[in-house]
Amino acid sequence: MTISSFQKQLTTQITNFLARKTISDSSKQAYAYDLKQFVNCLPGRVDQTSLKLYENQLKEWKPSVQKRKRSAVNQFLLYLYQKGELEEFFKLSETAPLPSQQEELEIFDLSSLYEGQEGPGKLACLFILELGLLPSEILELKWEDIDLDFGVVTVAKGSTKRVLRLDGALKELLFGIKNDNSQGLILSKAFTRQWLYKQIQSYVGGCGLSGVTAQALRQQYILRQIEKGTGAFELARLLGLKSPVTLEKYYKT
């Protein structure tokens, strides 16, 4: 059996395996994602050698992610054995190794961003830090996209829309600047991205954080969501991404 046909056969088994599980669609997506990664690592067979190769690749991930992937793979291996697809029962070690000493991305103290003077720079910073929005998305936001009573923001990106939870300091700031005449764009009129980047740069500089960029703020949003326990698929949805592939580096050790 060729590697491609072997992987195709196991991919079919993944579908059958997940069909037996009474779990949410998002959990099934996570299982499918982890198991397809596992199958793609196999050199045309399941044995101790191929499992060792896979376990070596797992070392790149954080212990919490390793634990999730190990659990999913072990359940799948047991399923294959019980179905008679494997003549021998294989199992990955349940214990993840200690995290490496590699430099990790850090969550910064950005409390000063909440204390600065109100204006477009502060508003943009909080939209990025609390909701992970892109500057281009902020520029297109309209008051009609925001429901302060229900605490939600609807963000349109192409033909898709996502609804994000709005609370904390950003919600308070929007309450403070909204009035009976508030309509149209949040920033009152159309501006360029270059203009908004300058507003952000000026504001963070005034808060003593001159090295912090819009990209860094979005990265901080990602790290804070991961710290809360947000999974890769849910985080991708919050950010408006089509897949969690670009987020994998944040879930690695």
Curated annotation (Swiss-Prot):
Tyr recombinase domain segment(s): 93-253
Compartments in which it is found: Cytoplasm
Residues annotated as the enzyme's active site: 157, 218, 250 (o-(3'-phospho-dna)-tyrosine intermediate)
One cellular component term from this protein's GO annotations in UniProt: cytoplasm
Main localization category: cytoplasm
The entry's keywords: Cytoplasm, DNA integration, DNA recombination, DNA-binding
Span of domain Core-binding (CB): 8-81
GO biological process: DNA transposition
Molecular function in Gene Ontology: DNA binding; tyrosine-based site-specific recombinase activity
Gene3D superfamilies: 1.10.150.130, Intergrase catalytic core
Matches recorded under PROSITE patterns: CB, TYR_RECOMBINASE
Pfam family membership, one: Phage_integrase
Protein function: Putative tyrosine recombinase. Not involved in the cutting and rejoining of the recombining DNA molecules on dif(SL) site.
HAMAP family: Recomb_XerD_like
NCBIfam families (UniProt xref): PRK02436.1 (NF002685)
Family: Belongs to the 'phage' integrase family. XerD-like subfamily.
Name of the protein this chain belongs to: Tyrosine recombinase XerD-like
Organism whose genome encodes this protein: Streptococcus thermophilus (strain ATCC BAA-250 / LMG 18311)
Lineage of the organism: Bacteria, Bacillati, Bacillota, Bacilli, Lactobacillales
